[in-house]
């Protein structure tokens, strides 16, 4: 009697998929597909396609909104969607998570402030040119002017000197003049004007045109001896050293374009500058290098 009236648990409610899985849909939204007890039918295709379709529609809606806003503001539409979460950088966009190491452009090692030379090169000579704007009779100038000499067999220009500023001028028959020996830019211009005035007083219609400084020469002393042999080996592409021909090392700096004469005693001569700042910059560039080849005897 008990066997006839007893009913197995969940009998009649069993699912054809398996006796352990109830036929009634009791899945919670918090439970993932399949319980691990029995394989579940593939039900993710439609749900995933629906989710993908919804995401695609949202992206299209936001993209169209951005395009309309950018067209109204005159900006280029952006291709980056804020809802896309990824750690990899997208092509053409800024990564969401920047690298902790910021790339830097390789530059020359800067000289520390503690290694500043504290030495200011002194200007020794300035060469300037000026155009007097007229043809000149050099014989007349040499005969009538003071402190002037003219020997056409040796040099085709009148050599004239004045005491203040203590300079020398080369005056050519074409009206061009070269002034040398000044210690500053102001002295060079003043001396050139004095030479032009002398030529005017001799009866020539001299003007003062196109004054220009062509070269500056400076010098200084680093106060320690230098190993020139090691310097020329390390900086072969910039320097040359032939002690049998010239006792100084010739260093041709690229920027600024200055030529330096470096002597073993520590004396340095800088030439080729057009402005004073180039001499100062060149010396500050070469000083740490010279310090690295200091003699320790």
Curated annotation (Swiss-Prot):
From what organism does this protein derive? Xenopus laevis (African clawed frog)
According to its UniProt record, where is this protein mainly located?
Answer: nucleus
Task: Report the protein's function.
Answer: General transcription factor that functions at the core of the DNA-binding multiprotein factor TFIID. Binding of TFIID to the TATA box is the initial transcriptional step of the pre-initiation complex (PIC), playing a role in the activation of eukaryotic genes transcribed by RNA polymerase II. Members of the TBP family are differentially required to regulate transcription and development during early embryogenesis. Binds to the promoters of select genes.
The UniProt annotation puts the region (Disordered) at 52-115
Tree of life domain = Eukaryota
Q: Where is the composition biased (Low complexity)?
A: 56-76, 104-114
User: Quaternary structure?
Assistant: Belongs to the TFIID complex together with the TBP-associated factors (TAFs). Binds DNA as monomer.
What is the annotated tissue distribution of the protein whose record heads this document? Answer: Expressed ubiquitously with highest expression in the ovary and testis.
Record's protein name: TATA-box-binding protein
What GO cellular-component annotations does this UniProt entry give? nucleus; transcription factor TFIID complex
């Amino acid at each position: 009697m008990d066997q006839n009236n007893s009913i197995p648990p969940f009998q009649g409610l069993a699912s054809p998929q398996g006796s352990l899985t109830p036929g009634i849909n009791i899945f919670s939204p918090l439970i993932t597909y399949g319980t691990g007890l029995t394989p579940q039918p593939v039900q993710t295709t439609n749900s995933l396609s629906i989710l993908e379709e919804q995401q695609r529609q949202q992206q299209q809606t936001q993209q169209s909104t951005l395009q309309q806003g950018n067209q109204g503001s005159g900006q280029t539409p952006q291709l980056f969607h804020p809802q896309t979460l990824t750690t990899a950088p997208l092509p053409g966009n800024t990564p969401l998570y920047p690298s902790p190491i910021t790339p830097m452009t390789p530059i020359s090692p800067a000289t520390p402030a503690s290694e500043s030379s504290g030495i200011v090169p002194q200007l020794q000579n300035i060469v300037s040119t000026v155009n007097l704007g007229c043809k000149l009779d050099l014989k007349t100038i040499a005969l009538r002017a003071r402190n002037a000499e003219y020997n056409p067999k040796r040099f085709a220009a009148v050599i004239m000197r004045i005491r203040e500023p203590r300079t020398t001028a080369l005056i050519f028959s074409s009206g061009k003049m070269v002034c040398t020996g000044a210690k500053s830019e102001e002295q060079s211009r003043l001396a050139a004007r004095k030479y032009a005035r002398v030529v005017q007083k001799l009866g020539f219609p001299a003007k003062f045109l196109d004054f220009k400084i062509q070269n500056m020469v400076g010098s200084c002393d680093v106060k320690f001896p230098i190993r020139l042999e090691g310097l020329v080996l390390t900086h072969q592409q910039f320097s040359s050293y032939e002690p049998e021909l010239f006792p100084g090392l010739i260093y041709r700096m690229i920027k600024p374009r200055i030529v330096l004469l470096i002597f073993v005693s520590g004396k340095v001569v800088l030439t080729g500058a057009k402005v004073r700042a180039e001499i100062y910059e060149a010396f500050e560039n070469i000083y740490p290098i010279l310090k690295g080849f200091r003699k320790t005897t």
